Amino acid sequence: MAYLELDLQIATEETANLPSEADFRLWVEKALPEVDEEFEVTIRIVDEEESHALNHEYRGKDKPTNVLSFPFEAPPGLELPLLGDLVICAQIVAKEAAEQNKELFHHWAHMTIHGILHLRGYDHINDDEADEMESIETELLASLSISDPYLIKE
């Protein structure tokens, strides 16, 4: 089983309805490979202003976003257990959950797992990659008794 060193940073004043550190730990561990290795992950919960600034600087997108993933790339020959950093915008996650008629807690789980899969190298740039990533997310969420986040709810 993977060993996780989790650094949870709360950098938003809106802390109502945030998941606990134990929740984040569970979701991250679900998305890690089942290997006997150590992983270090930072999750930073931010406001829309910080999300917007980071999304603009690193992705060229002039708006806040739900989750940003920053994989750690060690220099050649250096092996460290750092997987990377996730930056999750609390306000965007809450807005999306409301707009998509999803339970807020479930959407937090989805965004965390989605971000960890990005840190592990998964992506959704093309349809095949998106299908694979969505399938893994759906399976991991189902193991937590969370329904398929890609099903449209009326």
UniProtKB/Swiss-Prot annotation:
Zn(2+) binds at residues 114, 118, 124. Signal peptide: none annotated. One of its GO terms (molecular function) is zinc ion binding. Its EC number is 3.1.-.-. GO terms for biological process: rRNA processing. Keywords: Cytoplasm, Endonuclease, Hydrolase, Metal-binding, Nuclease, Ribosome biogenesis, rRNA processing, Zinc. Its main location: cytoplasm. InterPro entries: MetalPrtase_cat_dom_sf_prd, YbeY. It comes from the Bacteria. GO terms for cellular component: cytoplasm. Coiled coil: none annotated. It holds the Pfam family YbeY. NCBIfam families: rRNA maturation RNase YbeY (TIGR00043). Belongs to the endoribonuclease YbeY family. This is Endoribonuclease YbeY. It comes from Marinomonas sp. (strain MWYL1).
